[in-house]
C-alpha cells in the first residue's frame, strides 16, 4: 500500500497557527471552518511566527451582549476582536505569539452582505481578515490608521482572490 506524501510546509503551518473554531450560531449559509482558518492565516502569516486564535460564531443576542459589555454599544455588530497581547499582559519572552479571540455574528454578516450586494463568503472573508488585523494591532479610529488598515485589507482580500471590499463595484 502506498503512503500519502507528507508536506512539511503544511505541518509547519499547523504548528505555527491554531484556530479554535466554534459555531454557536443557528444561522445557515456559513462558510466551512477551513475557510475561516485560511482567511485568518492569510493576515497573520507575514507578521506573526505563531498565533492562537479563538473564533466563535454567535447569534445576535449573544453578540449584542458582548458588544454592550465590552464596547458600551447596545447592538449586535459584525465582528469583535479581543487581543490578549494588548498592554502588559504577557511576559516579553512569549510576545512573538499572538493570542486573541474573534466573535463574528453571522446574522449581521449575512444581512450586511445582502445590503451591500456582496456574496456571504466574500463578506465573511473580509470580516475575518479585518478582525485578525485588529488582533495584530491595526486600527481605524484615526484617518491615517484607517488608510493603513484598509490598504492591508484590500491587499489581503485581493491575494485571496476577492475584490476590494470597500468599492461598491467590487473592483
Curated annotation (Swiss-Prot):
Q: Can you tell me which family this protein belongs to? A: Belongs to the endoribonuclease YbeY family.
As to how many cofactors bind and how, the note says: Binds 1 zinc ion.
Q: Which GO terms describe its biological process?
A: rRNA processing
- What keywords are assigned to this protein? Cytoplasm, Endonuclease, Hydrolase, Metal-binding, Nuclease, Ribosome biogenesis, rRNA processing, Zinc
Residues bound to Zn(2+): 130, 134, 140
Function field: Single strand-specific metallo-endoribonuclease involved in late-stage 70S ribosome quality control and in maturation of the 3' terminus of the 16S rRNA.
InterPro entries, from UniProt?
A: MetalPrtase_cat_dom_sf_prd, YbeY, YbeY_CS
One Gene Ontology cellular component annotation? cytoplasm
The record lists its disulfide bonds as none
What name does UniProt use for this protein?
Answer: Endoribonuclease YbeY
Report the cofactors.
Zn(2+)
